[in-house]
């Protein structure tokens, strides 16, 4: 628990060996790391790489706080393991609950969104970095920290929900998800996550 903040997450796997993951990691100076990632491809190999990446991140964040540097260190350490596997898309936010500031770095993952207390998107954070494991040389562009006003909502995700397809080949879409969050913005974080899950399941029907 973080004083003044309500945080929740979930994975909606396509199989029991999903490559998606999330984590909340204690970082330096009483900040918290918010991690969302996806291993390209699925299967037991992807699940093992996901576990390895999580372990690396928890080790790196003991001595590094800048999200860009953290992801660079992750690439350095896990790149040899990914040569024959694929790559990982990862977004990492560093929340300072005292300053209400969110620093962010993105290695090929879906953008993060900041919604205000009225549920309107006031910022879409795109840093445009390449996924972890594609190249040995790795660098991310910086982004300005986001200041979180009272009632703000920060949304981290992979492409799984917006690109989920139903039996009619229609995508769930990011706008549908953001609209759903806006409608339920007064609910708790865990309730919002559950509502999104229910809507995605209902939307998919007999699709994938």
Task: Go through each PLM region and give its residues.
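Conserved short acidic donor-positioning loop in nucleotide-sugar-dependent glycosyltransferases
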Residues: 161
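… and, occasionally, acidic/histidine-rich disordered N-termini of signaling adaptors
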Residues: 1-155, 198-208
């Amino acid at each position: 628990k973080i004083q003044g903040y309500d945080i929740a997450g979930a994975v909606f796997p396509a199989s029991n060996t999903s490559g998606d993951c999330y984590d909340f990691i204690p970082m330096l100076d009483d900040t918290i790391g918010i991690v969302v990632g996806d291993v390209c491809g699925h299967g037991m190999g992807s699940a093992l790489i996901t576990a390895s990446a999580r372990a690396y991140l928890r080790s790196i964040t003991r001595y590094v706080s800048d999200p860009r540097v953290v992801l660079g260190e992750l690439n350095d350490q896990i790149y040899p393991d990914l040569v024959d596997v694929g790559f990982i898309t990862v977004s990492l936010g560093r929340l300072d609950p005292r300053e209400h500031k969110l620093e962010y770095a993105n290695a090929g993952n879906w953008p993060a969104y900041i919604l205000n207390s009225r549920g309107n998107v006031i910022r879409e954070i795109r840093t445009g970095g390449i996924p972890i494991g594609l190249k040995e040389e790795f660098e991310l562009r910086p982004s300005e920290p986001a200041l979180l006003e009272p009632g703000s909502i920060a949304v981290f995700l992979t492409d799984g929900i917006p690109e989920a397809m139903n039996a009619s080949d229609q995508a769930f879409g990011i706008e549908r998800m953001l609209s759903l969050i806006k409608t339920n913005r007064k609910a708790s974080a865990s309730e919002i996550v559950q509502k999104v899950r229910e809507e995605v399941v209902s939307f998919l029907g007999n699709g994938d």
